[in-house]
């Protein structure tokens, strides 16, 4: 506990709240350019090769982040334009964003019947 004299000399510091999704900058989505498309392995109990992409956010020139590519198969490559949204992947440390499928250069998932809206698939006729 500080004394009154100590508080007169130096005020208490305000604790700044850290943003969970700094790259989105209070926006629902951001447009990005793919720099590298690769796979990474998940944390301990799980085992797989998860598809991720290293992206550069267009509006924030020096901001780079990693985004997860959901669904089976993708057509993304270097210099593809993608739209990212928030939403972390629990077993991939440091991955806090997801690519929106069916938008810009990211094609929708083929032969998808359920949960189509998250994978950019139109309603079957």
UniProtKB/Swiss-Prot annotation:
Annotated keywords: Plastid, Ribonucleoprotein, Ribosomal protein, RNA-binding, rRNA-binding
GO molecular function: rRNA binding; structural constituent of ribosome
Signal peptide: none
Record bears the keyword Cell inner membrane: no
Pfam families: Ribosom_S12_S23
GO cellular component: plastid; small ribosomal subunit
Principal place of residence: plastid
InterPro entries attached to this UniProt entry: NA-bd_OB-fold (IPR012340), Ribosomal_uS12 (IPR006032), Ribosomal_uS12_bac (IPR005679)
Localization in the cell: Plastid
Family that this chain belongs to: Belongs to the universal ribosomal protein uS12 family.
Record HAMAP family: Ribosomal_uS12_B
Functional summary from the UniProt entry: With S4 and S5 plays an important role in translational accuracy. Located at the interface of the 30S and 50S subunits.
The protein's name: Small ribosomal subunit protein uS12c
Taxonomy of the source species: Eukaryota, Discoba, Euglenozoa, Euglenida, Spirocuta
Gene for this chain: rps12
């Amino acid at each position: 506990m500080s004394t009154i004299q100590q508080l007169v000399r130096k005020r208490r510091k305000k604790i700044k709240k850290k943003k969970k999704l700094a790259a989105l900058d209070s926006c629902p989505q951001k447009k990005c350019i793919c720099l590298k498309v690769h796979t990474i392995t998940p944390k301990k109990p799980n085992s797989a090769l998860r598809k991720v992409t290293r992206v550069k956010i267009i509006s924030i020139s020096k901001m780079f982040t990693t985004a997860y590519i959901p669904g089976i198969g993708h057509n993304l490559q270097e210099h593809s334009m993608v739209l990212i949204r928030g939403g972390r992947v629990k077993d991939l440390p440091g991955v806090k964003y997801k690519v929106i499928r069916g938008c810009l250069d990211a094609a929708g998932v083929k032969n998808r019947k359920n949960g189509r809206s998250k994978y950019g698939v139109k309603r079957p006729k």
